[in-house]
């Protein structure tokens, strides 16, 4: 029995019964409920930030829960308690007679710790009381001005190793970086602890939402606390930074990613669901609830979710959608759109009818009116990665599998780079009368680290840093914009182990000879033998080639089995999220690391994890901050701390000693 369950056991008239119902789950999550400890406080909120209260209550056999109420600090919450049973629609293992009691969209303006409780009564009058706690984090007196704009740059999977590798590719000599990364020039740096609510190793959903809700979510869940129902869209909610600042200040929201826009990181800024894969409902929520988030810019891949079912490339289904009754408390209390099962919906046309410009290509993006909201969908699912986009633009590497470039194989030769998307997003959002929150994600740092495709994630990190430069330049010019650069987690346990001791030509010859003796013992240079790899940077900001002599070598500590020859992979792996992945030429792409052409080298690196991909790690990740309020981001912090620091800067003003990091434009790197 949980130590915080207080059984108010009322005897029957005969005095024969002393049983009572049991509270099996209490939300928001707390150690007080789970273990009886008051510390640490798990759930924290801003003054006035909205969240849901919920309890799962199992009655005695043959009984039914007939009433429930919630209290905060002993005072009843003055809101309707919705009560439903689990006769249908609950997860496996939850008894059918279990009742779920919910109060939607509560808030507290009183700073400090609070105890909340649920009191539930079953049909025979037996009662149960369970307690939890949460904290309202106060705003503090400001020492500086409020920030008008917040830009969050999220390098998905980008740990310290990924940042370091990109810096080395940018140029090193005698131990010094020749062309420091833009993110290296930021004023302040912190280390972020990344764990989710249910694991030391987070996935991208809670990795993102922790930054913009102030609370931990379970893996695979976005903007919600876990519950016992199977419905992916009815979980207890917590208000996002975008929703809070739009509701209280009128700020607008921009979301930019190189992934499919339904993916965990972009969705984790505006969408509430316990299933990060429920694509139809996720993109519907972007549009239908834009009045709650202020969504003004949405760019990335993911066209398949916006096209009516039956259209070639469409992935819309009713099974990944939602529909609530207009009388549902979720609709009434949160003000959300009820939704409908409408797989035939044409969301592109609906965005356009609502006044959004639509850009399916870079050419259309360049022409889009910066005074109008913007929808950009440049691929059916994830966009191509930087290495393949750059090769497509240069026209020199015909490394696709149908005679052209990789982007030609995907049918998407005119995709923008992330920095181009970032610049356009800022040009649109700077017209926001009350300021904006903008999230920019370099998504395939993570996706290519999963694939253990070193050169592709290194160039995606360079692409991401070019977007960082765009944001930094804007912040420097405006003086009222706080920019942070961080990651949701590290991916693959990447380790920069040294440099090749041979030329690329010799490396190719050794690969042909095969085996460990040639590809490890004859190639890997450690310590002083690693030297300084020299990548020549072209005018477009990327290496002329990644197959250089004496190249940088990267190993992995969280890898699956792979074959390694250290050379650039000719093609990316097959992206199974693409709607045409089973058709030529995309079906010809390798399914995993063991099916690549370099498997012919027969140097098998045995993995530490099962499956075909490298995995996320629990390693802390760097965070760099620039602009007013940057100096609040120092030390070792929890990912949820970031939310409160951002909100403080936007709502009350800068609290760290005044800094002028946004007042002077940083120098551009010289070539």
Language-model-detected regions and their locations in the chain:
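Short, compositionally biased P/S/T/A/G/V-rich stretches that sit at domain boundaries
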Residues: 18-47
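Surface-exposed, short loops/turns at beta-strand junctions within beta-sandwich domains
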Residues: 105-113
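Gram-negative bacterial Sec-dependent N-terminal signal peptides
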Residues: 1-19
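Aromatic/hydrophobic beta-strand junction motif of beta-rich domains
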Residues: 51-61
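A post-motif C-terminal structural segment
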Residues: 86-91, 148, 155-209, 218, ...
């Amino acid at each position: 029995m949980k130590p915080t369950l207080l059984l108010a056991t009322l005897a029957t008239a005969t005095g024969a019964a002393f049983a009572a119902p049991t509270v099996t789950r209490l939300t928001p999550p707390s150690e007080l409920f789970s273990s009886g400890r008051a510390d640490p406080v798990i759930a924290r909120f801003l003054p006035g930030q909205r969240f849901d209260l919920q309890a799962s209550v199992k009655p005695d056999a043959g009984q039914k829960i007939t009433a429930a109420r919630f209290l905060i600090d002993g005072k009843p919450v003055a809101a309707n308690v919705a009560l439903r049973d689990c006769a249908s629609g609950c997860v496996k293992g939850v008894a059918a007679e279990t009742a779920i009691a919910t109060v939607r969209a509560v808030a507290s303006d009183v700073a400090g710790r609070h105890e909340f409780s649920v009191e539930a009564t079953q049909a025979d009058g037996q009662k149960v009381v369970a307690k939890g706690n949460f904290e309202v984090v106060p705003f503090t007196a400001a020492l500086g001005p409020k920030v008008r704009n917040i830009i969050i740059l999220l390098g998905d999977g980008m740990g310290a190793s990924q940042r370091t590798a990109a810096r080395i590719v940018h140029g090193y000599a005698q131990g010094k970086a020749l062309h420091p990364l833009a993110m290296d020039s930021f004023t302040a740096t912190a280390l972020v602890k990344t764990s989710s609510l249910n694991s030391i190793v987070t996935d991208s959903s809670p990795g993102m939402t922790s930054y913009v809700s102030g609370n931990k979510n379970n893996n695979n869940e976005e903007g919600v606390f876990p519950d016992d129902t199977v419905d992916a869209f009815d979980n207890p909610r917590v208000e996002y930074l975008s929703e809070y600042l739009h509701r209280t200040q009128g700020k607008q929201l921009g979301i930019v990613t190189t992934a499919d826009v339904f993916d965990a990181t972009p969705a984790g800024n505006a969408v509430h669901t316990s299933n990060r894969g429920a694509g139809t409902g996720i993109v519907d929520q972007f549009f239908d609830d834009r009045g709650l988030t202020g969504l003004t810019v949405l760019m990335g891949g993911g066209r398949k979710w916006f096209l009516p079912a039956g259209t070639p490339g469409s992935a819309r289904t009713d099974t990944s959608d939602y529909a609530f009754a207009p009388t549902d408390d979720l609709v009434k209390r949160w003000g959300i759109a009820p939704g409908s099962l409408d797989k035939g919906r044409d969301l592109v046309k609906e965005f356009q009818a609502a006044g959004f410009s639509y850009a399916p290509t870079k050419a259309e993006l360049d022409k889009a009116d910066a005074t109008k909201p913007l929808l950009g969908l440049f691929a059916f699912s994830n966009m191509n990665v930087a290495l393949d986009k750059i090769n497509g633009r240069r026209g020199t590497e015909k490394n696709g599998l149908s005679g052209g470039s990789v982007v030609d194989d995907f049918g998407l030769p005119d995709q923008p780079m992330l920095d181009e998307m970032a610049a356009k997003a800022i040009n649109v959002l700077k017209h926001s009368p009350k300021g904006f929150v903008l999230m920019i994600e370099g998504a395939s740092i993570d996706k290519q680290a999963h694939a253990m495709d070193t050169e592709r994630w290194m160039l995606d990190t360079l692409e991401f840093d070019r977007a960082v430069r765009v944001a930094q330049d804007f912040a420097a010019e405006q003086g009222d914009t706080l920019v942070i650069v961080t990651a949701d987690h590290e991916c693959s346990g990447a380790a920069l182990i040294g440099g090749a001791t041979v030329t690329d030509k010799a490396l190719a010859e050794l690969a042909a000879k095969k085996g460990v003796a040639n590809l490890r013992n004859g190639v890997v240079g450690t310590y002083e033998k690693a030297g300084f790899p020299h990548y020549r940077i072209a005018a477009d900001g990327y290496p002329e080639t990644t197959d250089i002599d004496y190249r940088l070598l990267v190993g992995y500590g969280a890898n699956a089995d792979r074959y390694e020859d250290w050379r650039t992979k000719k093609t990316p792996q097959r992206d199974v999220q693409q709607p045409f992945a089973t058709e030529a030429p995309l079906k010809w792409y390798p399914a995993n690391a063991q099916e690549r052409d370099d498997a012919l080298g027969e140097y098998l690196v045995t993995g530490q994890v099962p499956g075909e991909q490298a995995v996320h790690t629990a390693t802390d990740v760097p965070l760099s901050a620039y602009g007013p309020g940057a100096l609040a981001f120092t030390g070792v912090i929890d990912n949820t701390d970031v939310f409160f620091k951002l909100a403080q800067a936007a709502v009350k003003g800068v609290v760290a000693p005044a800094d002028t990091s946004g007042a002077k434009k940083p120098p551009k790197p010289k070539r």
